[in-house]
A protein has these predicted regions:
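Immediate post-signal-peptide N-terminus of mature secreted/exported proteins
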Residues: 27-74
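Amphipathic, heptad-repeat alpha-helical segments
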Residues: 68-87
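C-terminal amphipathic alpha-helix
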Residues: 30, 38-46, 58, 107-142
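Short, solvent-exposed, charged loop/turn and helix-capping segments
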Residues: 81-100
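Bacterial Sec-dependent N-terminal signal peptides
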Residues: 1-10
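C-terminal segment of classical bacterial N-terminal signal peptides
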Residues: 15-25
Length: 142
């Protein structure tokens, strides 16, 4: 009888903890999704690139000031903007710009993870990688 009671309590605790983790993950995803909806993609390539550079500057400031909890807002804004570029560039540039947009999306995820983990060194390293990809993107859209 005692063993059954202990197993029942253990199972209930496991279910409760699983529910808490799911709610926490859902809340984090919802927060990231809400920010994505707020990013407005300009109509022109120049407008998108200006917005990317502004968000990149904001991201660099956030990382420099060690406010890593805010990294994902700026990283995901850059991702949304970069994903809007392939449809706006000339056909001969589209494939390369799509490749850069994929790299930016991966780096945005990496920045989010390292920022959420409060890992300053890894976040700075990912920001440096993003700097290089954005430099290449600048050359691709010209």
């Amino acid at each position: 009888m005692k063993l059954t009671r202990i197993l029942t309590i253990g199972a209930c605790a496991a279910i409760a903890l699983t529910g808490l983790n799911s709610q926490t993950a859902f809340a984090a995803e919802k927060e990231h999704a809400e920010h994505k909806e707020k990013t407005v993609v300009p109509e022109s390539v120049d407008g998108i690139m200006d917005a990317i550079h502004k968000a990149h500057g904001d991201l660099a400031d956030v990382v420099k000031s060690k406010k890593l909890a805010d990294v994902h807002h700026h990283a995901f804004a850059i991702r949304v903007l970069a994903n809007g570029l392939p449809a706006k560039v000339a056909a001969d540039k589209k494939a390369r710009v799509e490749g850069s947009a994929k790299n930016i999306a991966k780096l945005a995820e990496d920045l989010d993870k390292t920022g959420d983990a409060n890992d300053q060194a890894a976040t700075e390293a990912n920001l440096k990688k993003l700097d290089g990809v954005l430099k290449a993107l600048d050359a691709q859209v010209k």
